[in-house]
Every structure is written in C-alpha cells, then in structure tokens.
C-alpha cells in the first residue's frame, strides 16, 4: 500500500525543509539514472508508444517524475513514516499517492492516443469468473508464501545476531490497525486497483517482472520495516507471474485486494493486540 509518500511531503516542518529538498533532488537523480539505464537497455516506452517529439518528451518527463515520486522518494526517506504526526494525519491525504498514479496513467494513455483505456490497462470481460477465482487463489496462496519467506528471512537474520528485537509496533501501523473498517476498505480498494494498474499493468510490460517487483518493494521503503519489504517483493513476484500468465489485470487486482484485506482487517489488528498483551 502506497499511503505515505505524499503525506510526508505535506507534513515537513520548516526545520526539515532543506533535508526534504535534498531528498527530492536525490529522488529525481535516481529516477533520471534509472530511465537512462532502461534506455541503454533498449526500453524506451515513451519513444515506442508516443508519436511525435513533443509527446515523447512529455512522456519521458512523466516517467521520470512518477518514478521519482512513487519509487525513489520512499527509498530516500527510509523509516520516516514513524515521524508523521498521527494526530494531524488527515485520512484522505493517504490517497494522494494513488491520485497521482491515476493522473499519470491517464496522461500517458492520452499521449499514446492509439488504444482504448481498457486495452491500455489490460482489462477485458472474458472469462470473468475464472479470473476472479484465480485472483482469490493467488491472494490466499500469496499470503502463505509471503509468511514462509518472511519468516525464513527473519530466522536467518536472527541467527546472525544482527537483528535487534523491536521495542514497539511502529506508530503508523497501530494507527492503521485502529482505523474504522470502512476506511480500511477504502485503502484496500485504492491499493488493489491503482497500484496494480501502475506496477503491473503499466510497468511490468515495459520493464519486466523482476524490475517492476523491485520498484513495488522500493515504494514501501518509507515504513522502515525490512522484513515487510521482503514480503512485499514476494507477493509482487507472485501477482506479477499471474499477470504474465493471463495477460489480464483483473486476477492481479483481486489477488492484491485479498492480500491487503487479510493484512489490514485481520493480521495487523491481531498483531497489534498480541504485541500490546505481550508488552503488558
């Protein structure tokens, strides 16, 4: 769930303005480098999909901008979600990032101008029930695999003695766990549709399964939870493989919804309660 990249930008105080500017600059530089390396590898979607120099230039700038905002800014602000003033946090601001992604997708689609929106998003009405079934199976099995992989990673790190036991649940996670069910459903709905449209429907066909999954994991860096990143990368690979097999975004949307729904509605509240009981 991309819930706090733009939220942090809204809550930067005057004392942290210079640091924020440097983070933004670094994010743009990383994005420029990434797009340049992709171009050297022959991946230039702004050239291949857009007609005319002006449209190609605008598309390239859009790509650099969205990668800077959605992927690399969270990397440069690793762990800063803990610094958000939760008392001042306005719920609709959590969806700002999804609005930005939506605007990007619509602008890119308009710059192309040669394909329907449904085709651009890899959506069709054929085999609806089979896609829904596949999505539910992928989401459920993805949870099992993610728990196994994350547990194995945590166990391996614990064996080395390099992982300090956390003293408390991150405040942002407690805040999310205590949200009303309706708000949680809104977050899930935004994440399952917009994030899948961007990372799977847009990025994966253009940069590949592995790199789009890496980008998806990087977009969650601001939470400052390394094992969460492992889990996000794992489920992204699994959902991405489903997209590669079906060529349709709907199973991915359903799988993402199942995964985030279980996480927000069941696992996270349970984990917060269990941690509170253990500490008490």
List where the protein language model places each region:
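N-terminal, membrane-interfacial amphipathic/helix-forming hydrophobic leader that caps
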Residues: 1-130, 155, 261-280
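Transmembrane helix-loop-helix hairpins at the membrane interface
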Residues: 7-13, 25-37, 143-151, 163-280
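Short alpha-helical transmembrane interface motifs in multi-pass membrane proteins
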Residues: 86-90, 101, 134, 183, ...
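Extended, compositionally biased low-complexity polar/Lys-Gly-rich tracts
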Residues: 100-104, 136, 141, 185, ...
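"…centered on the first transmembrane helix and the immediately adjacent amphipathic helix/loop
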Residues: 114-172
């Amino acid at each position: 769930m991309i819930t706090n990249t733009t939220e942090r930008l809204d809550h930067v105080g005057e004392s942290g303005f210079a640091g924020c500017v440097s983070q933004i600059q670094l994010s743009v530089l990383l994005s420029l480098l990434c797009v340049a390396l992709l171009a050297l590898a022959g991946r230039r979607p702004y050239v291949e999909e857009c007609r005319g120099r002006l449209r190609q230039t605008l598309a390239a700038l859009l790509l650099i901008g969205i990668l800077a905002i959605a992927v690399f800014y969270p990397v440069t602000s690793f762990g800063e979600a803990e610094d958000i003033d939760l008392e001042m946090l306005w719920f609709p601001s959590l969806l700002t990032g999804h609005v930005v992604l939506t605007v990007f997708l619509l602008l890119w689609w308009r710059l192309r101008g040669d394909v329907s929106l449904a085709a651009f998003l890899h959506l069709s009405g054929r085999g609806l029930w089979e896609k829904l079934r596949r999505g539910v199976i992928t989401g459920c099995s993805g949870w099992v695999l993610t728990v196994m992989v994350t547990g194995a990673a945590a166990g391996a790190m614990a064996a080395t003695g390099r992982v300090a036991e956390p003293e408390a649940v991150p405040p942002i996670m407690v805040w999310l766990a205590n949200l009303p069910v309706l708000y949680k459903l809104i977050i899930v709905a935004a994440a399952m549709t917009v994030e899948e449209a961007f990372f799977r429907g847009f990025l994966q066909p253009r940069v590949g399964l592995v790199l789009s999954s890496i980008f998806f994991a990087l977009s969650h860096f601001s939470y400052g939870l390394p094992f969460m990143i492992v889990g996000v990368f794992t489920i992204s690979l699994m959902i991405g493989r489903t997209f590669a097999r079906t060529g349709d975004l709907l199973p991915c949307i359903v799988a993402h919804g199942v995964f985030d729904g279980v996480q927000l509605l069941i696992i996270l509240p349970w984990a917060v309660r269990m941690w509170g009981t253990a500490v008490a």
